[in-house]
Curated annotation (Swiss-Prot):
This is Large ribosomal subunit protein bL32. GO terms for molecular function: structural constituent of ribosome. HAMAP family: Ribosomal_bL32. Residues 1-20 are annotated as: Disordered. It comes from Paenarthrobacter aurescens (strain TC1). Keywords: Ribonucleoprotein, Ribosomal protein. It holds the Pfam family Ribosomal_L32p. GO terms for biological process: translation. Belongs to the bacterial ribosomal protein bL32 family. GO terms for cellular component: large ribosomal subunit. Residues 1-19 have a biased composition (Basic residues).
């Protein structure tokens, strides 16, 4: 394992750590039953009834799992 020869300065440490960024997910805007929902592409969506109770999960219009 590599061992640093000298102590790294605070500025260099922070400059190096600044490169570790989280990427924002690409959300897809869909309109269902008059409501705008944002979801991740290629993931199952929760189908709810009018009261907001989760019924099941669907993907590409098919039921894939119970809620």
């Amino acid at each position: 394992m590599a061992v640093p020869k000298r102590k790294m300065s605070r500025a260099n440490t922070r400059a190096r750590r600044a490169q570790w960024k989280a990427t924002a997910p690409n959300l897809v805007k869909t309109i269902e039953n008059g409501q705008v929902t944002y979801s991740l592409p290629h993931q199952a969506k929760v189908v709810t009834d009018s009261a907001g109770t989760a019924l099941f999960l669907e993907y590409k219009g098919r039921k894939v799992a119970d809620a």
